[in-house]
Amino acid sequence: MATFKDACYHYKKLNKLNSLVLKLGANDEWRPAPVTKYKGWCLDCCQYTNLTYCRGCALYHVCQWCSQYNRCFLDEEPHLLRMRTFKDVVTKEDIEGLLTMYETLFPINEKLVNKFINFVKQRKCRNEYLLEWYNHLLMPITLQALTINLEDSAYYIFGYYDCMECENQTPFQFVNLLEKYDKLLLDDRNFHRMSHLPAILQQEYALRYFSKSRFLSKGKKRLSRHDFSDNLMEDRHSPTSLMQVVRNCISTHMNDCEWNKRCHVIVDAKNYISIMNSSYTEHYSVSQRCKLFTKYKFGIISKLVKPNYIFSNHESYALNVHNCKWCQINNHYKVWEDFRLRKIYNNIMDFIRALVKSNGNVGHCSSQESVYKYIPDIFLICKKEKWNEAVKMLFNYLEPVDINGTEYALLDYEVNWEVRGLVMQNMDGKVPRILNMNDTKKILSAIIFDWFDTRYMRETPMTTSTTNQLRTLNKKNELIDEYDLELSDVE
């Protein structure tokens, strides 16, 4: 029983403005839709159901019925979902605008209540006040919202969400923004609405209001790779594939600094209808490059590492070793389809082997060494503390020599041409015979930064950018990168 969905269905019949604003895919005829994957709340109709991916941001936040309208909370078009979406910092004035919008779209007065009651009583055996028949009148005005952190911004999607106790498999979390407003003013507003209802409905209205306005906010979730769908990718088998984003726009662009003022546009119904008549869609192809995806890929590699290679005498690259049960790696995993990751793995292992061999370690493939447990962490460049600790333990394992208070390790074993070039690039044009700890860190990080320079990466994919940001980046030709040409970050 989705209260918000029911309210939209009944209230859209009131006038022309409501019929335009409150049109939901969940209340229309069902059309073929993508397969659902996660359990959560549809941001468009607020019902708890199975969710599918959004074509605007790749997050799972829309039900299979609402997906037909392709609405995203990051759109520019002021549809109902966009007008309910606020961005930090939310002020009391912003909330006043939201409450005014609610009162405009979902009014409760004596005349309207009688109209709905008479409509219900026209049906056979409906003289009682059963809650399912009057569900649309039982939606209180609250400051309940689902929130998500994207880059440096927190977004709040206000609405009336039932079943808060149910399992949430999405990155959105419930928050109560009542502290940003006056509790007594909100109470008064709802008591006034409630006073027009029959006594039996007043009790249910009050119960719903207090349960949805006095709850404790939950801690914000951290995004993971699995929160984003692969369905927006042009070629799901290509690791450098672009992601196709569709955004709903209007002819009169509004600046992002006025994000929270979008709900004010319905004050003038004629102007709002004119704005919506100018709506159109913009399509963008964006890179999937970001820390979130990179961290996920390196996490997989760290679990596949065969550290025995650093003591081996194989002439081939680490990924090309065959017929050696200690060094041969399973390269059938999808992650190895990315040529950048193959290069990084081969070069990191080649450089570490050169360090180990240069410092008198004459082990072989089957050796069981204490340093092995730290090798996988050297690929976790996004986890700085763990990465630094791994490099430190590797360097100490080399038994460096103290010279004037600084410890040095030898580097006189042959490395491949790619590694040699990177070493020269980062060590003033030459390959040094001795390295200190900082030199070792610089070279190891340079091998990774050559293709994945995480220092300058976004935290989340560009699909989570606002429409204005996408438009600006597109003009600068910064939505895509040159990996398909095998050009690295440095090049």
UniProtKB/Swiss-Prot annotation:
Its main location: host cell. Residues 42-79 are annotated as: Zinc-binding domain. Residues 82-176 are annotated as: Important for cytoskeleton localization. Residues 1-81 are annotated as: RNA-binding. A motif (pLxIS motif) lies at residues 485-488. GO terms for biological process: symbiont-mediated suppression of host cytoplasmic pattern recognition receptor signaling pathway via inhibition of IRF3 activity; symbiont-mediated suppression of host cytoplasmic pattern recognition receptor signaling pathway via inhibition of IRF7 activity. It comes from the Viruses. InterPro entries: Rotavirus_NSP1 (IPR002148). GO terms for molecular function: metal ion binding; RNA binding. Keywords: Host cytoplasm, Host cytoskeleton, Host-virus interaction, Inhibition of host innate immune response by virus, Inhibition of host IRF3 by virus, Inhibition of host IRF7 by virus, Inhibition of host RLR pathway by virus, Interferon antiviral system evasion, Metal-binding, RNA-binding, Viral immunoevasion. GO terms for cellular component: host cell cytoplasm; host cytoskeleton. It is found in: Host cytoplasm, Host cytoskeleton. Residues 320-491 are annotated as: Interaction with host IRF3. The integrity of the zinc-binding domain in NSP1 is important for degradation of host IRF3. Belongs to the rotavirus NSP1 family. HAMAP family: ROTA_NSP1 (MF_04088). Interacts (via C-terminus) with host IRF3; this interaction leads to IRF3 degradation. Interacts with host IRF7; this interaction leads to IRF7 degradation. Interacts with host CUL1 and CUL3. This is Non-structural protein 1.
